[in-house]
Amino acid sequence: MFIDTEASGLPKKWNVPYSQDDNWPHIVQLSWLICTKDGKEVKRQDYYINNNDFKSAASAIQIHGITEEFRQRRGKDRSTVMSILAADLLQYSPLIVGHFTELDLHMIGADFYRSGMENPALELPSFCTMMATTHYVRNPQMKYVRLGELYSTLFHRKLENQHNALADAKATADCFFELLKNGDITDAKIERQQAEMVKVKAEIKSAGYGIPVLIVFLLTV
């Protein structure tokens, strides 16, 4: 599964519980692709969230271009979207891949919390193309390479429609399979990164404590 989120802003702190709602931004667009191991796309999902319990920061809208009017008109209820994501996580038990996966895992973790749902992603392996491609960094002032820069390096063309979650999820998938093909990603490297993600998932589990227990979602696939 290749996943990307566009959000209402950035976290103020990374080590506080999701119950501190004003600390954690809200997802405004959530997209993911399900692919086979050889890169064949099985399905894609793309949703905007229209709940009125938050507003995006002007700086965030400037980046992703998702206005309040647009998401209210085009979006779905948060719980509906998170239920669809949870169903796919449970059905496919995928490797979850993102570019800056830590942020995406926190974003879906916070919105699972807001929806009163358990977070199936915490029980699944994950991989971050940003963490795996530090050797592609050309700017000595940068620690990681941005998705658009990685894409243009690998494919010698500009990534179009950046900061649209579906476009970025597809670009992450393209980069992952290209990196797999050229040997920059191997099964061993994916396995080694799981140890690095243990701390991230522990923080997410800690942040998500206190999920309301009276709300029970039955997901049948």
At which residue positions do the language-model features occur?
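Interfaces that engage single-stranded nucleic acids at replication/repair/recombination sites
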Residues: V221
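Metal-dependent phosphoesterase signature
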Residues: I61-I84
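Metal-dependent phosphoesterase core characteristic of DEDDh/y 3'-5' exonuclease domains
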Residues: W24-I66, A87-P212, F217
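Entry/capping segment at the start of metal-dependent catalytic domains
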Residues: M1-K40
